[in-house]
């Protein structure tokens, strides 16, 4: 297939991203400064880090809306462990393991109950979120202050750069490469697509369906934990609400990136570009003085438009056939 045609959606997203940056640059010229542009990604790049493995979950025919609560739980756990005197490197490792465990819990409940993944992860969203609030209350970390006192080397980590590129953005680029290779260049990635197209056929084809689902959900949980660590480093405090605003932007990024909400198709590159598109939309509106409520409403509207557009695109042949029948009936 012609590469231009194969990656037409990704090319369109890249062009739209450039247009968006230029448009906001006309409103606020600071956004056209390369340093401001790069470092402004630190405010939203964790959305992209979570959206990448979430793409694999959605392509497999699943759904995970608990990652925001997982981020909050992992963040406050990191703070509590450090507060109890645990060495920070060990606390970070345990936090990453906790994120993976949250993902495994989601996968286990989905596989062994057969309940819709949206319902299961809705329940675990409240479970993890409630656990984060409980842990926060027990540690006395209520309100917006959270748990602070982290070493300067840790709090500086998310604010330093390498070759002029902010460290969170470097993490995002590394994650992009890793998940692109995993999804588009390995047997596991092929299995994810096949499971999303038909889990029953995949089962009959001797594809390890359960193991694959455990892996993609665990990776989403682990990515949530990575996002939690970066956010704690960036803000300098561990709070239970750090991932509260991630749900809609991340899902919007995955769907806008080309993933079929019913499973079977999707693109890591598309999700990465869409995450930047959604992030710069929020950032640009904020720099233009638009209130957060309007920014959130626009993100929600964007998700609705994308879902409707994708649905029309998927069923365009049936729509054209219906329209043709209607026209012929009127002519008769």
Swiss-Prot record:
CDD domains: TM_PBP1_transp_AraH_like. InterPro entries: ABC_transp_permease. Keywords: Cell inner membrane, Cell membrane, Membrane, Transmembrane, Transmembrane helix, Transport. Induction: In the absence of AI-2, repressed by LsrR. Induced by AI-2, via release of the LsrR repressor. The complex is composed of two ATP-binding proteins (LsrA), two transmembrane proteins (LsrC and LsrD) and a solute-binding protein (LsrB). Part of the ABC transporter complex LsrABCD involved in autoinducer 2 (AI-2) import. Probably responsible for the translocation of the substrate across the membrane. Belongs to the binding-protein-dependent transport system permease family. AraH/RbsC subfamily. This is Autoinducer 2 import system permease protein LsrD. It comes from Salmonella typhimurium (strain LT2 / SGSC1412 / ATCC 700720). The gene is lsrD.
